[in-house]
Amino acid sequence: MHDRGGRVTRKDVARVAGTSVAVVSYVVNNGPRPVSKALRERVIEAIKETGYRPNGVAKALALGTTGTIGLLVPNIKNPYLSELAHAVGNAARQRGLNILLGDSADDRQQEASLLENFVLNRVEGLLFYGVDGCPPELEKLRDTTRVLVFDSWDSPSFAHCMRLDEGAAAFKAVDHLAEHGRQRIAMITGPLDQRNSRIRMQGWAEALRARGLQEDSNLLQSAPYSRSGGYQAGEKLIESAVDFDGLFAANESQAVGFLAACSEAGVSVPKDVAVAALNGTSMGSFTIPSLTTFEQCVADNAESAVECLLQANEPQLLAAQGDLIRRSSCGCESSYV
């Protein structure tokens, strides 16, 4: 069953799984061609049965370590997640570790497939940012891998968690718009089937109630967490008969899209509509006008997350740090930071 040196090969796995060596490679490398769920599971079972380990980690496994941690994010095109990935990479390299990065592309099936890939590659730890919460596939890492989950309210009992109080952050941003005298504050939410979207919307509503302002469902537009999503939601709000003088976006990319919609429609920001957003990045300094955002301390949070992943034995709950950065879009003086 094995080659002459006694080493299990992909050919052995293919024989046990009843498939081709190419298909085994697609499963191990997570591409480049798709593999059906049933066939993928068959290959994974064959890998477990034969004891096969992917090339590149065999020597490290013999020493009991791979020197690699994984980072799985839902969409690397999201500027905040790009900054997080960069910061995690820096924190890992400072500790002599490699990073294996996975991008789910906002697809739960892709997310599950990538989790299987991390298991196969025997990462020592996994930093996980879910498409929407924690999928059941995370349980497969319970006995083998340290896990830290970002911004989840349903993290498994064995995992560490780093979480921003997104409701409080949204409250602070919306309340700041109200401080500028805005009375009708609209919101671009994320997809409403995602829990974090609902938490951010709750923060918006609580801020309005605290100021005695009206909650109006006509002031809400749901959109993907993207520039195009924010642009399309902005078009709908501007073209509607709804009167609004403030806008809170659930993330920075949506806010950037909204600014573009305002520019095309001749809506002045902040004169006509004051704007603030959640999960800002350095990009907010360079929009026109510059964007007021609640920004997480990404570098510090990444350092804390990696250190916790490597050192803490019992599951820890870490509070992500951040603050509101006031720039021009809300009516404050611009701050290029």
Pin down the residues of each PLM region:
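Flexible loop/turn connectors
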Residues: 235-337
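Short acidic capping loops at alpha-helix termini that bridge into adjacent secondary structure
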Residues: 183-184, 215-219, 268-272
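N-terminal helix-turn-helix DNA-binding module of bacterial transcription factors
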Residues: 1-66, 334
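Periplasmic-binding protein-like
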Residues: 122-130, 186-189, 220, 241-254, ...
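Short beta-strand segments enriched in small/hydrophobic residues
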Residues: 21-25, 61-75, 184-191
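Amphipathic helical "hinge" segments at domain boundaries
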Residues: 37, 41, 50-117, 121-124
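Hinge/beta->alpha junction and helix N-cap segments in small-molecule ligand-binding domains
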Residues: 74-83, 101-110, 161-172, 188-233, ...
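Flexible loop/hinge segments that line or gate small-molecule binding clefts
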Residues: 128-172, 193, 213, 253, ...
